[in-house]
Amino acid sequence: MSLCIGSHISFSSKDGICKSVESDLSLDCYQLYISNPKAFSSTEYKESDLLSFRKSGKKLFVHASLIYNLCGSKEGEDCPKYKRNLEFTRRGLAHDLDVCALMGARGLVVHVGAARDREWGCQKVAETVNFVLKERSKLTDRYSEILGKDIRKERTLLLENCAGEGTKLGRDIPELFKIWSLIERKEQVGFCVDTCHGFASGSMDFGKTKGIDSFWREWEEHFPKESLRLFHLNDSKGILGCKVDRHETLLCGRIWENKPEVLAHFLEGAKGREIPLVLERKDNTVEKELEICRALVE
């Protein structure tokens, strides 16, 4: 059993997914956006490119648009933009899930959204998840025809925890569990835990071995082990409980600075459970970070 670690990579629709991945052969797994993460738009893809990637067998995770809000609006159903935003999010997620399924991606990672009324928000997130896993479109029918089976059964959605900022949902394990408990097709829904987010929220102290052990205990008390499908491996610029989402290079932030042995303890836990890890910072230290992580768990 070896550590499965990679990073977020840039993707050009002109080059195609296969070429984008081939340029980063040192990675065990990959994450990318398949459309503009901050715009109301979707990208069309060559079916041949998606199928070529599927045949490659590479471990790919796709990150959904950052402007999706599975609640529709943080202001609730009385907000004038609620219906439009909810429809956009649901339509976009269903489209992205079909693209991911055709290319054989391991999951679509999504920030769950925000709501002032957290109880209502958790219910609305679950409603949206239940909706998009069943939703059918012309694209669904086309891709199902290509694969010779209902592609909706291959949709996999990964809900990501937040840093606890303002009205954002998914700030701790109990809140994630509240959402998950309302989801119908649990076998098609997993989680992505961002270490910076968990630390910044104050609910996951990855900076101490005891905190890491506590995280695993709490997680496995709430969820089946296979529900945690991915880690976003990021250090944090902010202190524990700062409620600020600012990633930092590994061993240079408030989680693991001068604490390689604690990072090693965390990595061993992920390795033993066969959970892939993706680095998200876009700087020139990624290769060095990969080298350090692999050396720590040799």
Sequence positions of predicted segments:
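Hydrophobic faces of well-ordered beta-strands that scaffold small-molecule active sites
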Residues: 3-9, 28-32, 60-64, 108-110, ...
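Active-site beta-loop-alpha junctions enriched in small/polar residues
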Residues: 8-12, 33-37, 65-67, 113-115, ...
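Active-site acidic/histidine proton-transfer and metal-coordination neighborhood
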Residues: 69-190
